[in-house]
């Protein structure tokens, strides 16, 4: 029997809150997605002004980070033409803004943001994780 750690809805709310606060601080309304360790959506928020075209992008970033347990920007260099994993895109995202969420040595989910630049998306994702870590337990 497996003992699986995963994010719950309260955790997702904290991740979104932290990401939203940073997005407000930098003046960029975001789409924010949180998934469990298998990449299944737990919660999503489109801030007022978040781009409609960023809804699925944020969800794909979160999926990649949670299910693959790897930050989306780390896939970028590996997925260029000529490299062995070029073409794996489907739901996987290679654009910065998706980060795995770790509790100790367990990946418990992922957070993905979209609507800003990749650097802005990554900063907001990290702010969400930092807020969650500071307000959990």
How would you name each of these model-derived features?
Residues 1-137:
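Flexible, solvent-exposed loop/hinge segments and secondary-structure transition points
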């Amino acid at each position: 029997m497996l003992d699986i750690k995963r994010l719950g809805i309260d955790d997702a709310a904290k991740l979104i809150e932290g990401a939203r606060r940073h997005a407000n601080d930098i003046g960029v309304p975001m789409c924010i997605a949180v998934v469990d360790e298998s990449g299944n959506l737990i919660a999503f928020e489109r801030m007022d002004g978040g781009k409609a075209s960023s809804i699925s992008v944020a969800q794909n970033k979160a999926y990649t980070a949670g299910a693959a347990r790897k930050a989306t920007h780390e896939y970028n260099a590996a997925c260029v033409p000529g490299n062995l994993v070029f073409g794996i895109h489907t739901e996987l995202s290679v654009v910065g803004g998706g980060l795995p969420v770790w509790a100790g040595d367990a990946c418990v989910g992922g957070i993905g943001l979209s609507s800003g630049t990749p650097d802005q998306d990554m900063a907001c994702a990290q702010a969400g994780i930092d807020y969650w870590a500071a307000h959990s337990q």
